[in-house]
Amino acid sequence: MIDPNLLRNNLAEVAEKLKVKRNFMLDTEKLTALEDQRKNLQVTTENLQAERNARSKAIGAAKVRGEDIAPLLAEMDDMGNQLTEAKAQLDAVLAEINQIALSIPNLPADEVPLGKDDTENKEILRWGTPHTFDFEVKDHITLGEEANGLDFAAGAKLAGARFAVMKGQIAKMHRALAQFMLDLHTEQHGYLETYVPYLVNHATLYGTGQLPKFGEDLFHTLALEGEQPYALIPTAEVPVTNLVRDVIIDEAELPIKMTAHTPCFRSEAGSYGRDTRGLIRMHQFDKVEMVQIVDPDKSMEALEELTGHAEKVLQLLNLPYRKVLLCTGDMGFGSCKTYDLEVWLPAQNTYREISSCSNMWDFQARRMQARCKAKGDKKTRLVHTLNGSGLAVGRTLVAVLENYQNADGSITVPEELRPYMGGLDVIGK
């Protein structure tokens, strides 16, 4: 949620930025009208409350003097009804303003390039040289099926399209990748490993910005009688970031760096017909997520660090990749600046996204009321939150299978993974 003071004091400027940079049309007339109502109702409520307090004192004094207070009590009842009505109207207006505010995307940082979609993203760097092969390259689907390790037919039987079953050495490599990533982030990058619920309540989803705008992208449970509704997490960012919801953090404890390996669940609404085969776009996939809660003056520096941590995974696995700065038209709803890391996939002869690292500024913190305070200070500040994939495990598996394939259909195990796979150096044929 963007700063409500910006909406009150710089509405026209904010609306223009949202239009140009986010292609978002803010209804300024409606917001202005609601803000006028809010001010009037606020004044009315405060005046009625002050008058009610004064009348209450007058009744007490009249009672001491032995006067008939029945008429005064009747007036108090009437004033109480007026106050209740005014408060209800004020609450309704505030709720309507809040709903509009929840629908507004974050404002991009000044250095984010203007653009309509991913074709206008800015490439920052390339690392590694794409592998060349002297044989016909196979895609990960063929490699996985030939190794008897990927079974998409079984996934479809059990659950439907965009599900897969992994077995044997492929399943072991999938697990090894997640363990390798967690060990790297906890032992070398200073993250605290966390285990979090895979089902979360709606307050948690509002906190990180999935609700109310992106409800259709989630898998929701049917609430039993007396139970609250839940949704399956689309990313560990949701529960991990919300660990600081409604918390005032000592600034000396910042930054807080957390990582978690979880399954992620996405409906992929709007992705019909895209990546229908293979592991690239699944309803259920694993990801190792990195989250940082930082001093609001240091979040851009933290974004560079966090992105570097994701890059380190690719570098240690010797997987060629490129780093791109997303343009305004390709950024996520809550982000003010995002880097994507795209790994080279030989079978597709292109780079594909494997990590997205974002600085959310104070957008999520304002929704969550996550704040920090220096020792001795009375005033609190909103923290800044960042998140990034470190990495998407399934897509990393795809990259390893395709980049490390051999002419006979076997796959060489990257050196970094061998300790996690019992010393195996080759899998498959």
UniProtKB/Swiss-Prot annotation:
The record's note on its domains: Consists of two distinct domains, a catalytic core and a N-terminal extension that is involved in tRNA binding.
GO BP terms: selenocysteine biosynthetic process; seryl-tRNA aminoacylation
Positions bound to ATP: 266-268, 353-356
One GO term describing the cellular component: cytoplasm
Protein name, UniProt field: Serine--tRNA ligase
Domain of life of the native organism: Bacteria
Pathway: Aminoacyl-tRNA biosynthesis; selenocysteinyl-tRNA(Sec) biosynthesis; L-seryl-tRNA(Sec) from L-serine and tRNA(Sec): step 1/1
The family this protein is said to belong to: Belongs to the class-II aminoacyl-tRNA synthetase family. Type-1 seryl-tRNA synthetase subfamily.
Source species: Haemophilus influenzae (strain 86-028NP)
GO MF annotation terms: ATP binding; serine-tRNA ligase activity
EC number, as in UniProt: 6.1.1.11
PROSITE patterns recorded: AA_TRNA_LIGASE_II (PS50862)
Keywords of this entry: Aminoacyl-tRNA synthetase, ATP-binding, Cytoplasm, Ligase, Nucleotide-binding, Protein biosynthesis
Signal peptide as annotated in the record: none
SUPFAM superfamilies for the chain: Class II aaRS and biotin synthetases (SSF55681), tRNA-binding arm (SSF46589)
Function comment: Catalyzes the attachment of serine to tRNA(Ser). Is also able to aminoacylate tRNA(Sec) with serine, to form the misacylated tRNA L-seryl-tRNA(Sec), which will be further converted into selenocysteinyl-tRNA(Sec).
Annotated compartments: Cytoplasm
Record-linked Gene3D superfamilies: Bira Bifunctional Protein, Domain 2, Serine-tRNA synthetase, tRNA binding domain
InterPro entries cross-referenced by the UniProt entry: aa-tRNA-synt_IIb, aa-tRNA-synth_II, aa-tRNA-synth_II/BPL/LPL, Ser-tRNA-ligase_type_1, Ser-tRNA-synth_1_N, SerRS_1_N_sf, SerRS_core, tRNA-bd_arm
Subunit structure, interactors included: Homodimer. The tRNA molecule binds across the dimer.
Chemical reaction(s) catalysed: tRNA(Ser) + L-serine + ATP = L-seryl-tRNA(Ser) + AMP + diphosphate + H(+); tRNA(Sec) + L-serine + ATP = L-seryl-tRNA(Sec) + AMP + diphosphate + H(+)
Lineage: Bacteria, Pseudomonadati, Pseudomonadota, Gammaproteobacteria, Pasteurellales
The keyword Transferase is assigned to this record: no
CDD domains: SerRS_core (cd00770)
Binding site for L-serine: 235-237, 289, 389
